[in-house]
């Protein structure tokens, strides 16, 4: 890393499972957690802060750079031990996994029904507990998880839910990360056989199960869905290469690709561009407080961002069924400007029925 920096390379470092780099000595046995056997002996180990402080002192302090660390099973309070803003913080941002557990138990290969309440709790706990003390890393996709439209959205309403999911996290406080393919709505890959999967983590799951049952699980949970070649065009190999790609191309590339998205003004890609431009133009997104509404709902995620000068209201429906929305008591939508929505023909009423996977962003200033 130091050699890269000395050559002018590497303004941002991502450090994988950083909380695992210090282990308790003695190789003790553990039988508490069948999924993460032994994790209490190597997660947040005895020398973790010593190692990270050494790396900061000997490498990071010599350069103007940013560090992002991945940390499974970390809570907001534990994350602050690493990222709390100070002259000696060890990491700038931490990638947590709680927002990836809204439809599974700890790992994608132990699925359960999607729960918006679990997702909202993850978002809200990190927004509130890090406020004024640390900076959030915001994401919905990466190389270790299936495609988010197939998980938290709807392939039937791919465009609508893809846009809604963008809104759900792009207006939170923190730095958003967008994974390749997410910005134009790639979905899960569904091959015909389990033998087509290459990820070792996937292939090790339930080898004794019948093929049909394993295939259904892999279709839903495999991180290979995030590792198929990016779909640039509807041409051969999705325009990724004129040679032979290292891995299978998702068969839906004829309909879902960058070229198509660029020429469609209503595409997910162009929606992301609008949302990012708005985010950059609004100080309230960077500096505003966070307040969640509709906490009891399993269909709506509604939150506000507020400074003395601006108030932002974000409304996201996570269902294809109509849901009655009533503006919170301290908001009048008629007095606010509708900045962004994934539907045409929107009227500014304090009470309305949502359309499938509808999203709206309002501003008052």
What are these regions (language model features)?
Residues 1, 48-55, 122-126, 165, ...:
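Alpha-helical packing segments of well-folded alpha/beta enzyme cores
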Residues 2-13:
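Single conserved hydrophobic/aromatic residue that forms the stacking wall/gate
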Residues 11-24, 234-238:
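Short, solvent-exposed beta-strand-terminating loops
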Residues 31-34, 102-103, 144-147, 248-256:
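Short acidic (Asp/Glu) and glycine-rich catalytic loops that position anionic groups and cofactors
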Residues 40-44, 148-160, 255-266:
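Active-site rim elements
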Residues 175-178, 184, 189-365:
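Carbohydrate-interacting/catalytic domains
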